């Protein structure tokens, strides 16, 4: 009963403040029993209000961390992709991409970026990306540039997905040549 109330309160607070999984209390219950026997802990999408970033140092004490990225969320103050915004390289803040519905507003992205910096300074995961582009972003990020990182592309059936010249693909899709 108390645990359930605490979890609900934590989720409400995270959603209301736009913390996006930064401090979720729910993940503190039971993580140890799963992590203690692991040879390695492979993280994927840990955002969206179900995991606390604050757990990462504790988890790494139990087993090495491998973090497979699928977007830029771990590199920014909360954006999944930064698009043309360069703020993720300098600490975020006044974010043009942050949804207005977040209570913390656009400046809250600086707080989340700083929180990530503090947590990441206490861990040393191996970062895995599915693309060379995302690997370059990991290497550029002030939050993750010191981590060992590698690219492991998703497996694709090359009999179905055939490489072709960009100009041919753009023409087939009806896109402009540039």
Q: Where are the model-predicted features located?
A:
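A short helix/loop element that forms part of the nucleotide-sugar donor recognition site in Leloir-type
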Residues: 113-116, 162-175
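Phosphate- and divalent-cation-binding pockets in alpha/beta enzyme and binding domains
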Residues: 51, 136-140, 160
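Membrane-proximal helix-turn-helix segments that form the acceptor-binding/catalytic region
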Residues: 60-61, 73, 85-128, 136, ...
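Short aromatic-enriched loop/helix-cap "lid" or pocket-rim segments at secondary-structure transitions
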Residues: 1, 55, 77-82, 87, ...
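Carbohydrate-associated surface elements
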Residues: 133, 155
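Short N-terminal targeting/anchoring amphipathic segment
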Residues: 30-50, 64-70
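A conserved catalytic-core segment of Leloir-type glycosyltransferases
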Residues: 1-40
């Amino acid at each position: 009963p108390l645990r359930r109330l605490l979890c609900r309160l934590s989720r409400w607070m995270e959603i209301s403040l736009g913390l996006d999984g930064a401090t979720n209390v729910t993940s503190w219950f039971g993580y140890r029993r799963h992590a203690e026997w692991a040879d390695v802990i492979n993280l994927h999408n840990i955002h969206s209000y179900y995991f606390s970033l604050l757990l990462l140092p504790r988890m790494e004490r139990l087993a090495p961390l491998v973090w497979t990225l699928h977007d830029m969320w771990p590199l920014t103050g909360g954006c999944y992709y930064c698009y043309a915004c360069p703020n993720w390289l300098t600490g975020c803040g006044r974010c043009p991409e942050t949804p207005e519905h977040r209570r913390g507003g656009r400046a809250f992205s600086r707080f989340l970026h700083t929180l990530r910096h503090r947590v990441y300074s206490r861990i040393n995961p191996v970062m895995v990306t599915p693309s060379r582009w995302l690997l370059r972003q990991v290497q550029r990020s002030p939050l993750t540039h010191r981590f060992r990182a590698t690219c492991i592309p998703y497996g694709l059936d090359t009999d179905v997905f055939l490489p072709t010249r960009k100009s041919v693909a753009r023409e087939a899709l009806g896109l402009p040549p540039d």
